[in-house]
């Protein structure tokens, strides 16, 4: 298992193999990242290209934790106005969450450009690579990605029921599942 972590860390240029977390699928990885990251009163920017695996946890946190949401619209051809990200940033903005490519249109987002915007403003950048992991190049360091969520069963050629989350150094998430051994570890 650790060998697979090492391969994924190398493939995505994730700084450390022990920062690769295995999940049942991308939906679980996205829920773990989104729910583990956001706090009451945080503001998040996403696009209107997002999959329900991003939208539903965001809407839930909007209702339960008073997380506020803004969306960068795509035009009729599915293209993003990248300047809109900066125009939506507020003092309470915590993160930008962005799909790498739409599952409906196939349009790809320049995640390197969005990552640069996020980091220029001290924001966390979370990428949903469910459609692109194994298809388009993804480099967490070069594209300034803090959290990368992916599924294993599509272009990574893994079995159904596999996915993962890669975290940049210094990113911590609130646990969303608890239980187990009874020994504090």
Predicted regions and their residues:
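Pyridoxal 5′-phosphate
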Residues: 1-185
């Amino acid at each position: 298992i650790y060998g697979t972590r090492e391969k994924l860390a190398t493939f995505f240029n994730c700084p450390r193999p022990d920062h690769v977390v295995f999940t049942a699928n991308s939906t679980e990885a996205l829920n773990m990242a989104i729910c583990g990251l956001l706090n009451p009163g945080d503001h998040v920017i996403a696009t209107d290209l997002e999959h329900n695996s991003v939208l539903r946890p965001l809407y839930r946190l909007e209702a339960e934790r008073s997380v506020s949401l803004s969306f960068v619209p795509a035009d009729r051809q599915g293209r993003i106005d990248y300047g809109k990200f900066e125009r939506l940033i507020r003092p309470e903005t915590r993160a930008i969450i962005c799909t790498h490519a739409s599952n409906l249109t196939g349009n790809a987002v320049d995640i390197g450009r969005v990552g640069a915007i996020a980091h220029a403003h001290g924001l966390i950048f979370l990428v949903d690579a469910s459609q692109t992991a194994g298809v388009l190049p993804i480099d967490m360091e070069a594209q300034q990605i803090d959290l990368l969520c992916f599924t294993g069963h599509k272009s990574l050629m893994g079995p159904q029921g596999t996915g993962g989350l890669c975290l940049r150094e210094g990113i911590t998430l609130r646990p969303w599942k608890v239980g187990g051994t009874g020994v504090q570890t």
